[in-house]
Amino acid sequence: MEVDDGYVEYVPVEERLAQMKRKVVEEPGKGMMEHLSDKKKLMSVGELARGITYTEPLSTWWKPPLHVRKMSTKQMDLIRKQWHITVNGEDIPPPIKNFMDMKFPSPLLRMLKDKGIMHPTPIQVQGLPVVLSGRDMIGIAFTGSGKTLVFVLPMIILALQEEIMMPIAAGEGPIALVICPSRELAKQTYDVVEQFVASLVEDGYPRLRSLLCIGGVDMRSQLDVVKKGVHIVVATPGRLKDILAKKKMSLDACRLLTLDEADRLVDLGFEDDIRHVFDHFKSQRQTLLFSATMPAKIQIFATSALVKPVTVNVGRAGAANLDVIQEVEYVKQEAKIVYLLECLQKTTPPVLIFCENKADVDDIHEYLLLKGVEAVAIHGGKDQEDRDYAISLFKAGKKDVLVATDVASKGLDFPDIQHVINYDMPGEIENYVHRIGRTGRCGKTGIATTFINKNQSEITLLDLKHLLQEAKQRIPPVLAELNGPMEETETIANASGVKGCAYCGGLGHRILQCPKFEHQKSVAISSSRKDHFGSDGYRGEV
């Protein structure tokens, strides 16, 4: 029987989370936070075996212009203050306020201009000099802040430099690798890479080959690109792990690794897959980690992988984008779908509607079509081809409304979104931050409307209340009346410098009340019982 090289075993999200958290119940003597930090360093097996520890960041050819290098610490701090940038780390490269001084080739500068990007955003002002200097970086920025260019432009420069010095041979590469939590985000990032690579070719520079390495696509076509030699790979964890396990691609030459939406990667249970990827590195690489939120579990994850990292924060981790007007409305469950039509009148298209489950997405989509609204819908139950087609129609402006589950909230770039409607308040505040980050991008103001009712837990609503307070938004009466344990300990928390939950980053509760931590413990307990008794024991599978 012929073995299908394109086969990738699918492990459901629930099972991945159960595998990760099973240790919580198997080792009851450990404290809660100890379970988050007891894993080995994020290094390759070879590095661990040889006892290698990298203590210094990689060096690069890039240096900022002389007038930038001559800036005093006071001048640099003033620029950061003006751009609302917070930094942390040793020997931090200076911020640069224009792309010209970053020494990008003229084709890339022209492409930026053609895309209407005249000036760098705050994350780019500080993040690009950090990455170009070869430093490991933790980038904390709300979705829509322009963080994609912070890693795309430097990795194109690195790949171009390597290609000019010693061209990539057949089967070699990649030089740079990006790992994304979803196929949609990977495809979007790949498209950005291709646009800038094409601009270089038009100007006579060597052709850089890039690869989109995701599931749902025939692996053979991806391997054909690898065989020719590849400079840049944008991948999802599952397909990348499978190709590496089959020894179809090597990371021996990889110098730059980016983990985009790192909080989502860990939340979706991909941490072990990423550790598997690290096993394939043979030498030191520059590592970049980007996240919209920064709970303790991500901090631990980052410190095990990065060397003397520079943290660049353009908005406190967990706080929502200040360019979004957040409106929270109490709507009874049975009235939500009718009230939705009224909400759509608040702004002109395009509008995003987020739901917690697939059935609601389908129901709302059908209802809007019956009412004459030009709408499309995506969720995890739809084919990849159908999802891509719906997204393309929405992006092209041929459809006014996109109804989606959180599949669409993982970093997808929909320009000029006027309004985001949360048909359901998500169970985790991190998802709320990701969702409303679809609007209010690139300095433009957007609106986010969220429906709440008695179906939401009080802890979730307290998280929302505190986030609204931090973002200086109006607090609706139904939330203002809520008082939780955080109200009594706010003074102590501020004095200690610790805000909210150490596990998930929520602002309205502590780890002892964390619903996310409790849920994952429950999943682990449930899975361990199933393992002990099997499907033939009590309550066997029917």
From Swiss-Prot:
The Q motif is unique to and characteristic of the DEAD box family of RNA helicases and controls ATP binding and hydrolysis. It comes from the Eukaryota. The keyword RNA-binding applies. A motif (Q motif) lies at residues 97-125. It comes from Arabidopsis thaliana. ATP binds at residues 141-148. InterPro entries: DEAD/DEAH_box_helicase_dom, DEADc_DDX41, Helicase_ATP-bd, Helicase_C-like, P-loop_NTPase, RNA_helicase_DEAD_Q_motif. One of its GO terms (biological process) is mRNA splicing, via spliceosome. Residues 323-483 form the Helicase C-terminal domain. A motif (DEAD box) lies at residues 260-263. Belongs to the DEAD box helicase family. DDX41 subfamily. Residues 128-312 form the Helicase ATP-binding domain. The gene is RH43. One of its GO terms (molecular function) is ATP hydrolysis activity. A zinc finger (CCHC-type) spans 499-516. It catalyses: ATP + H2O = ADP + phosphate + H(+). Disulfide bonds: none annotated. Keywords: ATP-binding, Helicase, Hydrolase, Metal-binding, Nucleotide-binding, RNA-binding, Zinc, Zinc-finger. This is Putative DEAD-box ATP-dependent RNA helicase 43. It is an enzyme of class 3 (hydrolase). It holds the Pfam family Helicase_C. Its EC number is 3.6.4.13. SMART domains: DEXDc (SM00487), HELICc (SM00490).
